[in-house]
Amino acid sequence: AGAPTDKDAYKNRILYHFDDAQIVEIADKRVGLFKAFYQADLNQWYLAQIQILPEYQSHKIGWALITELITKATDNNESVALSVLKGSPARRLYERLGFQCVSESELEFNMLFHSVDRE
């Protein structure tokens, strides 16, 4: 199972909170996209999208970006939420970083990092 792959679904994923997107660069080369935004009503950050080029995925870039977000959240007693597709190997990374599955849909696991869990 995976996310819808039609052109409109792909475009919607890219445009969702597009203003919050950051291009990830290593040595002046664009290697990925990182998109997270703060949800004040929930006192949490939402990690909406992280994409790293395949040839850079073993360089711990995603780990570093997520760790930086977790540190920012922890410093302010905030949580971090995300959704991950079922079957995605990224779920193991999120679990190693302290995220826990709090619910699921047909396609995704919804995960949450509580800053108090790390204290």
Residue ranges of model-derived segments:
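Conserved GNAT-fold acetyl-CoA-binding loop/helix
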Residues: 1-13, 19
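Conserved beta-strand in the GNAT
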Residues: 23, 29-38, 44-46, 51
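A conserved beta-turn-beta hairpin within the catalytic core of GNAT-like acetyltransferases
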Residues: 38-48, 57, 76, 107
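Conserved acetyl-CoA-binding loop-helix of GNAT-fold acetyltransferases
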Residues: 52, 58-71, 92-96
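Conserved active-site alpha-helix within GNAT-family acetyltransferase domains
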Residues: 63-64, 86-110
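Conserved GNAT acetyl-CoA-binding A-motif
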Residues: 73-85
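Terminal substrate-recognition subdomain of acyl/acetyltransferases
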Residues: 107-119
